[in-house]
């Protein structure tokens, strides 16, 4: 779980920015989006094969 403690003289905005970065780095948002809808196993295999073919390029 991502946790951010507010430091002395730190604004709420900067703490929120740090929190968002931690969530992004942990992959929590992408996991939530992935689990929003059911994905059939055949489609999951197809997506993984496509990602492997691309080789993780940007």
UniProtKB/Swiss-Prot annotation:
State the family named in the UniProt similarity comment for this chain.
Belongs to the bacterial ribosomal protein bS21 family.
- Which InterPro entries does the entry mention? Ribosomal_bS21, Ribosomal_bS21_CS, Ribosomal_bS21_sf
Keywords of this entry: Ribonucleoprotein, Ribosomal protein
State the residue spans of region: Disordered.
Answer: 38-58
Q: Which Pfam families match?
A: Ribosomal_S21
According to its UniProt entry, this protein's organism is Nostoc sp. (strain PCC 7120 / SAG 25.82 / UTEX 2576)
Q: Which residues form a coiled coil?
A: none
In alphabetical order, the GO MF annotations are: structural constituent of ribosome
Q: Where along the chain is composition biased (Basic and acidic residues)?
A: 49-58
Q: Its gene? A: rpsU3
Please give the biological process terms from Gene Ontology that the record holds.
Answer: translation
Organism's domain of life?
Bacteria
Q: What is this protein called?
A: Small ribosomal subunit protein bS21C
Q: Which GO terms describe its cellular component?
A: ribonucleoprotein complex; ribosome
């Amino acid at each position: 779980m991502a946790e951010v403690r507010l430091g002395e003289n730190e604004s709420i905005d900067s703490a929120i920015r740090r929190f968002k970065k931690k969530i992004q780095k942990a992959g929590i948002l992408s996991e939530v989006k992935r689990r929003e809808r059911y994905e059939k196993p055949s489609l999951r295999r197809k997506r993984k094969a496509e990602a492997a073919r691309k080789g993780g390029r940007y």
